[in-house]
Amino acid sequence: KWAKYESSEIIPLWVADMDFRSPVEVTREAQEICKAGNFGYGICPQTLTDTIVRRMSEMYSWPVNQGWITWLPGMVCGLNVSCRAIADQGTQVITNTPVYPPFLSSPSNSGLTCTQVPMVLEDGRFTIDFDYLQSLHTKSGDLFMLCHPHNPVGTNFTLNELTQLSEFVLERGLYVCSDEIHCDLILEDSLKHIPFASLSDEIADRTITLMAPSKTFNLAGFGCSFAVISNPELRRRFKRAMSGIVPDPPAMGFRLAEVAY
């Protein structure tokens, strides 16, 4: 971001390229990898998968099976793959606004319509307009794209809000792509991140959860993200949408993700 605006008076403040250094353990490991000089293709080490499964259990009380994890080179890629996996003739994508721009471009990239649901400001906090949601015409199989915690308004949705959204999802027969890349950056001790898919087996069955270490540890340039999809058929559709287009993360991405976590 500083390269883009180095000669102007603009101060770039977006979050993907933070101005904090990555943890010393990560930079040290990157230096060791560079010294070894091997930058070939990578395969996810079992130790990283085990670390993520343990992390989900310990931090979020969310029992994740290692077979549910699918690796991606980035979160924007995951948003687009989710749209392609769900895409059918007439499929509608619903999302809250304002929102990270790829939430709005991903549907059109797959030939889908995007319905924007403006968030409402209540007591100094942005939240979902559930009355507006209920007024929408939807069909079974439509996709709700959730940004949780929300970028850019910063809302960490409460259990009550997520439960209300889950009831709407099940009532309408929707699928959900939940981008939870900021889940580790909850800065208030009184708040706790709740993965949307952890609410119930019924919700997990209809949810694609996207996560990555990139925002938390300033690793966006190493391209290592993952999707958690418990439904075998939904996971098959997701992987089919990736086929021949989406590469695995690089070896260094896998290794630095493990060190960071």
Model-predicted segments: where are they?
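N-terminal small-domain helix-loop-helix segment of the aminotransferase-like
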Residues: 1-74, 81, 260-261
